[in-house]
């Protein structure tokens, strides 16, 4: 079973995504902000996948994505960005920073499943 971490400050959206990930046979852990997720990473725990919201208080999903990709020990973990922000500029920025997939809210399970498969596929190809 794959371990997925959702980092999203929207509890309702988190619950919906969590349900979708469980249907896709993922063990899910949720963080309401990037700081505790980063601390958990630094303490040695690792997911097999990140699902990151972009707009969050304190540390944005983009900033957390940059943190993940800068660290040698985290940079190969697949990342799916999940946001209501669907501008080409934001999508291009996230992808340029190393996101493996970008999904806009509201999300259908098929779309999330495809993004997760894409992220895992990109991760395997890059190892």
Regions found by a protein language model. Give the residues of each.
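Two-component/phosphorelay signaling modules centered on CheY-like receiver
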Residues: 11-29
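The feature encodes the CheY-like receiver
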Residues: 14, 57-58, 87, 106
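Residue-level signal for the "D+5" position in two-component response regulator receiver
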Residues: 30, 58-59, 96
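Acidic, metal-coordinating helix/loop segments flanking the phosphotransfer/catalytic sites
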Residues: 30-49
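Active-site residues of response regulator receiver
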Residues: 53, 83
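C-terminal output helix
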Residues: 107-116
């Amino acid at each position: 079973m794959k371990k997925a971490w959702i980092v999203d400050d929207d509890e309702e959206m988190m619950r919906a995504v969590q349900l979708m990930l469980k249907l896709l046979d993922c063990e899910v852990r949720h963080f309401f902000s990037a700081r505790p997720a980063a601390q958990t990473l630094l303490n040695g725990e690792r997911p097999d996948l990140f699902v990151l919201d972009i707009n969050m208080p304190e540390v944005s999903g983009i900033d957390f994505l940059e943190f993940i990709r800068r660290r040698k020990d985290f940079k190969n973990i697949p990342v799916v960005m999940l946001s209501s922000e669907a501008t080409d500029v934001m999508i291009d920025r996230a992808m340029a920073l190393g996101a493996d997939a970008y999904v806009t809210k509201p999300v259908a399970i098929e779309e999330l499943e495809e993004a997760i498969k894409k992220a895992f596929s990109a991760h395997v190809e890059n190892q």
